[in-house]
């Protein structure tokens, strides 16, 4: 187990995930390799008893098992809903896909490391405290080094829809939070985006509500792409924004009962909410895989010619 952890750390270090992005960009490959060796030697050296008392099991779980994660807000009901939602989505992923995530992880932004996660669900509340600048710097680094955050304002999309004269309190809070990170231009998911095809074929991404668009990093037009069936695979959007209260649609009790009704009450809407969650998770984990896969018919046709 210890060797597996060291191997995982070495991979993360060499990829720059354990370094600030500015440092990683300037670090030569040879220096990175040397640093990784020194890091390994330091970790396998005998440590004082106090250091050995660290929660190794928790570290192993984060490093060696894919886990969906959510941000703790301090609101017990919201946090319980986030946990129950990711439990429900995890169970759905295990049942319908080859992915078998571990138990969802609750993330305290002030103390927990983000480097081990690719998917982070962040419900935004009207009374949320904007994290301090140093914490948001950590969030910004996470987003710039391969992580994706799903911000959910849970307000049915009234917050984000263009043309509204007033935004919801949740959206105003989200804007204050995002002021501390480098947010790319955003757009509603276009019909040809890989998110619409990452696992299921989808035309919308509902949650408990269904009035909100799903916003992602805007894709630049590629004049050489032609009539491509999917775009957006090469670079995974570091930020996804919805107002559809996704976690509430996914949330299940310990005995498997749904905790919240969809609005309107429609079993099909809940099924589509789960499928939306699957596509988002697969997109954050696989990136351009599905964008390549959907081109296979065209490639085979050209090979035949």
Segments from the language model and where they lie:
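A generic secondary-structure signal for well-formed alpha-helical elements
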Residues: 13, 97, 147, 178-185, ...
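Extracellular/periplasmic catalytic domains that process cell-envelope and extracellular macromolecules
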Residues: 60-63, 112-116, 135, 142-144, ...
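Helical hinge/lid and interdomain linker segments adjacent to catalytic or ligand-binding clefts
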Residues: 77-169, 211, 242
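Aromatic-Pro/Gly-enriched surface loop or interdomain linker
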Residues: 51-119, 126, 246-247, 254-256, ...
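An acidic, glycine-rich "communication" segment
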Residues: 64-67, 157-257, 263-274, 278, ...
């Amino acid at each position: 187990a210890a060797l597996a952890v060291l191997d995982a750390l070495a991979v993360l270090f060499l990829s720059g995930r354990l370094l600030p992005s500015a440092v990683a960009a300037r670090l030569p490959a040879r220096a990175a390799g040397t640093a990784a060796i020194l890091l390994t030697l330091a970790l396998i050296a005998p440590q004082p008893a106090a250091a050995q008392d660290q929660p190794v099991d928790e570290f192993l779980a984060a490093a060696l098992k894919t886990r969906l994660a959510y941000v703790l807000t301090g609101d017990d009901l919201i946090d319980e809903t986030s946990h129950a939602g990711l439990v429900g989505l995890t169970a759905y992923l295990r049942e319908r896909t080859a992915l078998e995530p571990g138990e969802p992880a609750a993330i305290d932004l002030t103390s927990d490391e983000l480097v081990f996660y690719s998917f982070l669900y962040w419900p935004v509340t009207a009374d949320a405290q904007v994290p301090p600048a140093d914490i948001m710097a950590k969030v910004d680094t996470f987003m710039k080094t391969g992580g994706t955050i799903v911000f959910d304002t849970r307000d049915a999309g009234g917050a984000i829809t263009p043309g509204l004269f007033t935004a919801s309190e949740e959206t105003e809070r989200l804007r204050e939070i995002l002021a501390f990170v480098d947010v790319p231009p955003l757009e509603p998911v276009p019909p040809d985006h890989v998110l619409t095809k990452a696992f299921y074929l989808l035309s919308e991404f509902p949650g408990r509500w269904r009035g909100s668009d799903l916003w992602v990093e805007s894709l630049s037009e590629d004049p050489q792409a032609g009539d491509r069936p999917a775009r957006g695979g090469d670079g995974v959007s570091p930020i996804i924004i919805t107002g559809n209260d996704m976690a509430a649609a996914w949330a299940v009790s310990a005995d498997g009962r749904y905790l919240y009704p969809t609005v309107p009450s429609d079993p099909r809407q809940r099924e589509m909410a789960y499928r939306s969650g699957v596509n988002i998770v697969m997109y954050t984990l696989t990136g351009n895989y599905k964008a390549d896969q959907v081109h296979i018919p065209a490639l085979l046709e050209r090979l035949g010619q």
